[in-house]
Amino acid sequence: MTIYNFSAGPAVLPKPVLEKAQTEFLDYNHSGMSVMELSHRSKDFDDIIKDAEKLLRDLMAIPDNYRVMFLQGGASLQFSMLPLNLAQGRKAYYVVAGSWGKKAYAEAVKLSKTIPFEPILLASSEETTYDHIPEIDSAKIDKDAAYVHITTNNTIEGTSIYDLPETHGVPIVADMSSNILAVRYNVADFGLIYAGAQKNIGPAGVTIVIVREDLLNDEPVLSSMLDYRIQAEAGSLYNTPPTYGIYIAKLVFEWLKELGGVDEMEKINREKSGLLYDFIEQSDFYTSPVKSPKDRSVANIPFVTPSQDLDAKFVKEADALGFKNIKGHRSVGGMRASLYNAFPRQGVLDLIDFMKKFEAENK
């Protein structure tokens, strides 16, 4: 039985990457050691992390005036690290179009009770259960603000921001955890990008931060571990980094480059997601909670049947047939097909075949 992993993260990894990691697991580069055993100060690991950064720069066309960091703590730590480094004494705007954007804003509000800055809710679609991307009134943005924070892909609700808001020069900061390397964004349009690795980059434990150099604070009053400048100047080696996760990320970057890069990956992702969206649209049994096609994610596709009982039956039968982790997030319900970069097109076709069969038997 073929297993298809629809998990929203940690998620499916490319089979060639896993196979290469397997062959190198006990003896990396004739060192007699596993990558997990390499000193982070060794030449072997120095080559790994430098190659990983170069590959990521090439894939995303990252300009030279941006620094790339491989950090720890997940994207959730960035909810605090970001305002601590960039926003002290200033305003910071937040667009809340999903659960993770809400958490980022809530963390900023919490921090503002002890750190002098003003988090402001610029736009939200919470009233309609995040079923769309809210309209953003750029006239409300103070030109002296520290940043405007967005989440480019809402993993739970299945919406995405593809067209960036006009911010009149105020840096856009993006949580890009679930669609980094899946669709093309112009890095120069952002002041800072951060992303947890466990969707499109590798195993959980690595967080990518890409920041424009002029935004690095000269004298932030905060812990060295939370200081972007210290981490950047140390080459992500201020303390022991997640070495094996960075190694897997490098292999994923190599795989993506060989595939044709981000532009080719976006074509593949739009085709995969389009197959499923088209089927849902043509069905009167399944429904997408995201009404506007322009807001729909290519990475995370939620859908429901006519009842919660049928949803539960669908998940149970799908799981038995090898469609794993397709249950929707507990806050939304229904089902969610996470079609990250490594998810195969055949898995989408097989899912649609099952959906047709389930509909015929339960309509």
Curated annotation (Swiss-Prot):
One GO CC annotation: cytoplasm
Binding residues annotated for L-glutamate, in chain numbering: 41
Pathway: Amino-acid biosynthesis; L-serine biosynthesis; L-serine from 3-phospho-D-glycerate: step 2/3
This enzyme's EC code(s): 2.6.1.52
Residue stretches in coiled coil: none
Protein's cellular compartments: Cytoplasm
Cofactor entry: pyridoxal 5'-phosphate
Major place of residence: cytoplasm
Keywords: Amino-acid biosynthesis, Aminotransferase, Cytoplasm, Pyridoxal phosphate, Pyridoxine biosynthesis, Serine biosynthesis, Transferase
GO MF terms held by the record: O-phospho-L-serine:2-oxoglutarate aminotransferase activity; pyridoxal phosphate binding
Record-linked Pfam families: Aminotran_5
EC class: transferase
Cofactor note: Binds 1 pyridoxal phosphate per subunit.
Domain of life: Bacteria
Sites of N6-(pyridoxal phosphate)lysine modification: 199
InterPro entries assigned to the protein according to its UniProt record, in alphabetical order: Aminotrans_V_dom (IPR000192), Aminotrans_V_PyrdxlP_BS (IPR020578), Pser_aminoTfrase (IPR022278), PyrdxlP-dep_Trfase (IPR015424), PyrdxlP-dep_Trfase_major (IPR015421), PyrdxlP-dep_Trfase_small (IPR015422)
Family: Belongs to the class-V pyridoxal-phosphate-dependent aminotransferase family. SerC subfamily.
Alphabetized HAMAP family for the sequence: SerC_aminotrans_5
Function: Catalyzes the reversible conversion of 3-phosphohydroxypyruvate to phosphoserine and of 3-hydroxy-2-oxo-4-phosphonooxybutanoate to phosphohydroxythreonine.
Name of the molecule in the record: Phosphoserine aminotransferase
Source organism per UniProt: Streptococcus mutans serotype c (strain ATCC 700610 / UA159)
